[in-house]
Amino acid sequence: MQAITLLGSTGSIGTQTLDLVAQYPERFRVVGLTSYSNVTLLAEQVWRFRPQIVAIGREELLPELRSLLTGMRPLPELVAGTEGLCQVAAHPAAQRVVTGIVGCAGLLPTLAAIRAGKDIALANKETLVAGGPVVLPLVREYGVKLIPVDSEHSAIFQCLQGVPPGSLRRILLTASGGAFRDWPAEKLDQVTLADALKHPNWVMGRKITIDSATLMNKGLEVIEAHWLFGLDYDRIEVLIHPQSIVHSLIELADTSVLAQLGWPDMHLPILYGLSWPERLATPWDPLDLVKLGSLTFKAPDHRKYPCLQLAYAAGQAGGTLPAVLNAANEAAVALFLQERIRFLDIPRLLEQVCERHQVIPAPSLEDILEVDAWARQQVELLAQQAPAQVLA
């Protein structure tokens, strides 16, 4: 039986992971759970899955969590704050850690898990986008395995099983195109928050749904793929694939192309991240290609998706620039979700913050954390200035 710790148990990845734990009780048991602030749902999960250790990110919510668990015997160890998240990530009873925390907040707990020798089912792309220069050397030092959970990287990981080293020519990441794939670029200045949250294929969290609409999600995945699979950026391409059935493809040295297909449902890549190197039988409906009829692909329109080019540029520049781009994007998307800025202000803000940054070529963890905070502050400062001067 696999003992797992789940970081970000109340989010989209976390709740779907627990669905799978409940479906396969003979295969998985929960050792630790964490949430940033959803104390009510976290308490419900603790009552159901009986972990040994639980963390709440916001320390002031710890008394409420303790109150919601009154009468539980045995009571799990309750911890809080970033230190508490890291304690859960490194707990000695866990064999595999699922990182479902959204954003750069997942970096420190993931590092704690790696240093504790845990294999990582990685659903937090920002860990590698921002922290790749620090994370990958630690992965090699501690001999742990990174098993990608993002559907695209899981697809590539699956396609690479059994492929001889040195045979990979390029990666083709697929993207749905998000909420505005059928909108002309000229109409994007009319986008509302409600429009941007209508993803055509996937059910996801709010932040990643906006990232899908801007294609920044795919840009971050390009950077993540660079770190996971060791390819230069000119060997990582993006295709718009409206049906979201082909989750990604690889091209090999002999021009053979391998692809992984499946319904647009995160349960499958999460399950593979939990069970690898095994595959578990599922009760789900099989893919029906006859019913689907056709699968289509096209190149992304860079006028419509400037964030994709910003991500490629940041990845190629390297150093601290990907961390700056990621932090600025998190801050800008948060402002858009609060309806404090417009949709097209997101790429404008990102470009301005990146232009202001002096890149540190070989950053330490401290450098990454410092530029992360700096980029968020810059977004807030720019957004507070007159839109006509700053965002036009």
Curated annotation (Swiss-Prot):
Q: In which pathway does it act?
A: Isoprenoid biosynthesis; isopentenyl diphosphate biosynthesis via DXP pathway; isopentenyl diphosphate from 1-deoxy-D-xylulose 5-phosphate: step 1/6
Residues bound to NADPH are T10, G11, S12, I13, N38, N124, E126, G205
Q: What's the EC number here?
A: 1.1.1.267
Q: Name one GO biological process term.
A: isopentenyl diphosphate biosynthetic process, methylerythritol 4-phosphate pathway involved in terpenoid biosynthetic process
**Essential cofactor(s):** Mg(2+); Mn(2+)
Amino-acid positions noted as binding 1-deoxy-D-xylulose 5-phosphate in the UniProt annotation, renumbered to this chain: K125, S151, E152, S176, H199, S212, N217, K218, E221
Q: What does this protein do?
A: Catalyzes the NADPH-dependent rearrangement and reduction of 1-deoxy-D-xylulose-5-phosphate (DXP) to 2-C-methyl-D-erythritol 4-phosphate (MEP).
Protein's recorded name: 1-deoxy-D-xylulose 5-phosphate reductoisomerase
Source species of the chain:
Synechococcus sp. (strain JA-3-3Ab) (Cyanobacteria bacterium Yellowstone A-Prime)
